[in-house]
Amino acid sequence: MVSANRPLIHPADFQGLKVRISGSKIADRYFRELGAIPQIMAFSEVYQALQTGVVDGCENTPSNYLTQKFHEVQKDITVSYHAHLQYAVIVNSKFWSGLPADVRGQLEKAMDEATDYTNSIAIKENEDALAEIKKSGKTHLHYLTDDQKAAWQKAMAPTYKWAQGRVGKPVLDLLAKELNLQM
């Protein structure tokens, strides 16, 4: 999701908007492609920065908008699904290949189950947060149409191309497939 004190529906709506980012190079690139001015800022400073106009908007998860009360200082939130937050479990390949096959299989199964479980919790928390934000009446939620999503994807396509060189096309293709994106 992304927010501001104006609707962010079309890529042109971002022109000149100061948007708080966490420092992600990908976020920096795609916001610049939208015409925004990314501002790296600590998470703990975001509420006050939104309240005082140091930044015009930010991106975050629905649960963070609710718990951090960002919706109280932003008139408009776009439920955009423009970014995907993921975490990786990384293990040394020599260590991994040294484990017996049955142990690797059990660990993979446990990771799959843990991933499914935590994803279900995140989905529920975010759905509940959106309902609470809407119920508060303090901000307007905007949901993008398929055509609007396509316009965002087109505007951010150079970032997708750039990221291919960093993480590889197969990884991004898998992500696009999982998120049902047309890239």
Pin down the residues of each PLM region.
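N-terminal secretory/targeting leader peptides
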Residues: M1-M183
